Amino acid sequence: MTHYHFVGIKGSGMSSLAQIMHDLGHEVQGSDIENYVFTEVALRNKGIKILPFDANNIKEDMVVIQGNAFASSHEEIVRAHQLKLDVVSYNDFLGQIIDQYTSVAVTGAHGKTSTTGLLSHVMNGDKKTSFLIGDGTGMGLPESDYFAFEACEYRRHFLSYKPDYAIMTNIDFDHPDYFKDINDVFDAFQEMAHNVKKGIIAWGDDEHLRKIEADVPIYYYGFKDSDDIYAQNIQITDKGTAFDVYVDGEFYDHFLSPQYGDHTVLNALAVIAISYLEKLDVTNIKEALETFGGVKRRFNETTIANQVIVDDYAHHPREISATIETARKKYPHKEVVAVFQPHTFSRTQAFLNEFAESLSKADRVFLCEIFGSIRENTGALTIQDLIDKIEGASLINEDSINVLEQFDNAVILFMGAGDIQKLQNAYLDKLGMKNAF
């Protein structure tokens, strides 16, 4: 049994990885900031110790896993090197783990977490599958056949992995603090494609993914009969979204997803494609799909009287549009109110007009102050720059949260990758509910 210490254990990937190693029988602990982060709930539920940062946390005979947000000058990393311990980056360590399984990486600018969560749930309906999801959830199942994991393109971290399969949901310009432009993003995905050992499953409507070259087959999914696997006869019901799936032009089977929105059907198609290629039992796959409950911070709902309170991680214009679309399709007779907290100054600056356009699809818009990051906590613009671009938009904070009570028959979308859950909880407290998120 190895003793692992995770520096930055509350990070979404680090939290998941720590849980996996714990499940596989290792001794696990970690350190992080003392502020509450939603990922710590799962860690505490498994009895994994979370410590404040301190060089004295590092002991002899530990293996230290270094989170991507922390430099080698961090006090705990310095102490680990002084003790001549093995210090392994998150990406390199995960890359070592996946080689023990038939692995499926899920990557793309948007939809990674939802698709990874769906993939792990559905595959476990037929074969034991360990998984690492970007919502801070991870599980290591002994004697697993498969390993499903989220692979992030930021700073080209995903190039540490050599998976058997890769699902590529889309290529889009994001992380403007690192990538120069869309061509730079494409180059990263192109390099990743050459790491894949068996096959790539890619969204057929993405113009950039259509240009990807690989040493393995590329299977495209979508809504067109020119795709290798596609959905037709899509019907929205009170149970979710029903659709027929065709493979190479031939009817494969009828499926029901309990979710709503075109993007959820696309996610399901990618997962069904993997299941088809690995010859998993389609009856088991269908049953598992119908019981998928979603992942953390992806359209998580709480209903109070005539209001539906939604917690969602959307922090890019396309993700915001998809979340609003889901609300419209699932609740066509309700008003849609967007409460959004921009994440990082560089992203807000780069997509200012796009944020305004996507948020304007809601009936009302409320904006929070911009949330910075460890690497970037100031910028040239303010939230007022975005407010000025959206008709009727206004600033909201914990002191003014009661303004949301006026929307009697509405879906209230709390969106963002920062600490917007503080605002959600403040509102829920006013409504008489506590600790929902």
Swiss-Prot record:
Keyword vocabulary terms for this entry: ATP-binding, Cell cycle, Cell division, Cell shape, Cell wall biogenesis/degradation, Cytoplasm, Ligase, Nucleotide-binding, Peptidoglycan synthesis
Pfam families: Mur_ligase, Mur_ligase_C, Mur_ligase_M
Top-level taxon: Bacteria
pH-activity relationship: Optimum pH is 8.2-8.8.
SUPFAM superfamilies: MurCD N-terminal domain (SSF51984), MurD-like peptide ligases, catalytic domain (SSF53623), MurD-like peptide ligases, peptide-binding domain (SSF53244)
Major localization class: cytoplasm
Binding positions for ATP per the UniProt entry: G108, A109, H110, G111, K112, T113, S114
InterPro entries: Mur-like_cat_sf, Mur_ligase_C, Mur_ligase_C_dom_sf, Mur_ligase_cen, Mur_ligase_N, MurCDEF_pg_biosynth, UDP-N-AcMur_Ala_ligase_MurC
GO biological process, one term: peptidoglycan biosynthetic process
Protein name: UDP-N-acetylmuramate--L-alanine ligase
The keyword Nucleotide-binding is assigned to this record: yes
Record field: catalytic activity: UDP-N-acetyl-alpha-D-muramate + L-alanine + ATP = UDP-N-acetyl-alpha-D-muramoyl-L-alanine + ADP + phosphate + H(+)
Keyword Nucleotide-binding: yes
EC number, as in UniProt: 6.3.2.8
Gene Ontology cellular component terms for the protein in this record: cytoplasm
Class of this enzyme: ligase
Function as written in the Swiss-Prot or TrEMBL entry: Cell wall formation. Can also use L-serine and glycine, but they are incorporated 4.3- and 7-fold less rapidly, respectively, than L-alanine.
Family named by the database record: Belongs to the MurCDEF family.
Cellular location(s): Cytoplasm
Single GO term (MF): UDP-N-acetylmuramate-L-alanine ligase activity
Classification of source organism: Bacteria, Bacillati, Bacillota, Bacilli, Bacillales
Metabolic or biological pathway: Cell wall biogenesis; peptidoglycan biosynthesis
